[in-house]
Amino acid sequence: LKAIEKYLRTKLKLTINREKSGVKKPVQFTMLGFGFVPTYIKGDKGKYQLVVSEKAWKRLKISVKAITRKTKPMSFDERVAKINEVQRGWLNYFRGASIYGKLRDVDGWLRNRLRYCIWTDWKKPERKRKNLIRLGVDQDHAYAWSRTRKGGWAVAQSPIMLTTITLKRLKQRGYIAILDVYTELNPSVYEPPYTRTVRAFFFKKVVV
């Protein structure tokens, strides 16, 4: 390793990042937001699949939270358009990784963030009551929920919002589910992850 470092410094005039350089096991290695985990397939010992690092997942959530913050002066349609843009850009970069399972959790979380925006946009109790009735909630439940002391994020995850602000209604407002974007960009999503050409995709990303 020292010989390699010397060659990089003296011959190629490259700066070495000590934190990111070294001999590591694949599961300890992350680069450009990617990492590796074992395939966990019987008989496939020593094989790994490409995944997204935890830092990259956190960055995605931070971006979405910034867009859906109630203090952000944006209309609902503007928020939806911005989220669609962010998630498509993120998936374009990470589409070669095995992320379908984790995306299902993110998909539900994204919808709740939009429900949170809708609930906070309604602001006054009377407006909340009327809108809930328009969405099919009976008078008594609409009144009770419009006066609830629960916070906006708790209400966004409650049955009253899950059954009224459905995925179908969100799509009617222009929202594109992150799972739909992923399957569009990655038609091979239903193939076993260990059948994909991980090495070629990864090093193509590194070179580019």
What are these regions (language model features)?
Residues 1-208:
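Non-catalytic terminal/accessory segments
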